[in-house]
Amino acid sequence: MKVFLLSLLCICSLRAEPPFWGTIFIDPDIIKPSDPSAYLSLKDAGQGRRTMYDRRENNWVILTPYLFNATYKDGLKIEVQVNPEFGNADDARKEAEKYSYVIGQLTTALRRDVETVWIHKGTNPFGGGNNNLLIHTGQAVKYINDGILEETFVHEATHTSLDSRHAKKPKWIAAQKADGEFISNYAKDYPNREDLAESYLPYFAIRYRPDRISKSLAKKIKQTIPNRIKYFDSLALDMYPVIKREAPSVNQLFYSEEKQLLTISWNSQVGAKYIIQSSSDFSVWKTVMTYIIADTILT
């Protein structure tokens, strides 16, 4: 009996080991530099006194950064604050434009609470939260070389825009418990702080970029966090610009009186969510609005 119990404990221990150390590293092509961005424009706003966090100091600093107002196609706006150490407004603007575009590749749901961006030199980790995204350009070079700059922004923006809304929600906590495992060591070590951000990128990959990851990777994600995946599905997050906002046109509408079955088909986008807008007047059945997750290009 003791031998059996010991074996059982060993098996459980192996099952509980997370499949990844950190999820920003699982695949560099989940978001590509060529993917669409909601970035629209950048307007100079001079310089002004601001309080910024600098990881090189491990503290808050008061500076007079170069200021830029980034505007996005979904109506969101961000003030980009560039450390004056970059020397002049032109060089600061280059940094602001560079990262404003990449941030625009994030979905509306991830940018909705981002009010400011801090840009410093230095090889220090990025950060999210405080209605902000923190960038150290030396570290950005490393992320770019590894192909994970965009994936890192997804992680950090999840902290900024999703943590406060969901990390302490009873349904999220219930999903964690139901899964019984963590997607990464980082999530396991800091379940309250990092689990949501660590889980969201893999979720995004299987739902919206399934063609860019291996089947084995997708299987591993689905097996490890199935209930967290269901939780994210339930949120109906605004996925623009990954998913276009225009409702697709119905290309077939057929009613079988014999079967009392109404069949509707439309050209869908893989990963998009749809519901049918119900009406007793068939003349208004012209478009499909967003809940059913599309698995093929024809739904």
Regions found by a protein language model. Name each.
Residues I30-L133:
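Auxiliary, metal-adjacent structural segments of Zn-dependent hydrolase domains
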Residues E246-T299:
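Short, composition-biased motifs enriched in small/polar/acidic residues
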Residues G104, T108, T158-H166, P202-R209, ...:
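Sec-exported extracytoplasmic/periplasmic mature domains
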Residues F86-E97, Y143-I148, T152, A187, ...:
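Soluble non-cytosolic domains of exported or imported proteins
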